[in-house]
């Protein structure tokens, strides 16, 4: 996971560098950073949490997503101590913040910002459905994760508004 995340960081750093001349450094870094966080979210959530998962028998595989909102979540996770719900919120904050900051330079930013946050929510739904379909990765599909991810994206969107007001990407090139 770490190697894939670092390799993709190198790629998106080059993308930001290439865009910075045309869009300004704030927008270039924000948009490339948002794309990188979306890739890292996929890496974190669609690879097995532990290697050697083995085979998940069809009989023990879930047929549907858990609709038990706030149901049992582990107390900790290897990346971040605390609750898994806190982690699910935290991982979507950067994507929401960077997206809003990245589109703030354009007049259509007021339309693009909420559209991007909706897409982040749909991305969370897609991740959960893939976790359901790919039983071999031994992950669970849970509505609580979607709610927490959307909450994180919205918090990030609020942070992105504040960052846009401070950094004013529309004034820099």
Which sequence ranges carry the predicted segments?
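Bulky hydrophobic segments
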Residues: 1-138, 158-173
């Amino acid at each position: 996971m770490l190697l894939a995340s670092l390799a993709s960081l190198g790629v998106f750093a080059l993308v930001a560098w290439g865009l910075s001349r045309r869009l300004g450094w704030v927008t270039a870094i924000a948009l490339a950073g948002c794309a990188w966080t979306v890739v890292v979210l996929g890496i974190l959530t669609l690879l097995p949490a532990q290697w050697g998962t083995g085979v998940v028998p069809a009989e023990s595989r879930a047929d549907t997503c858990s609709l038990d909102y706030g149901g049992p979540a582990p107390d900790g996770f290897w990346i971040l101590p605390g609750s898994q719900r806190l982690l699910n919120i935290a991982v979507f904050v950067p994507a929401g913040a960077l997206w809003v900051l990245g589109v703030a330079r354009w007049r259509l930013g007021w339309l693009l910002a909420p559209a991007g946050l909706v897409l982040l929510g749909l991305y969370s739904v897609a991740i959960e459905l893939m976790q359901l379909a790919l039983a071999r990765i031994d992950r669970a599909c849970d509505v609580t994760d979607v709610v927490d991810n959307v909450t994180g994206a919205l918090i990030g969107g609020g942070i992105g508004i504040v960052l846009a007001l401070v950094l004013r990407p529309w004034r820099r090139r």
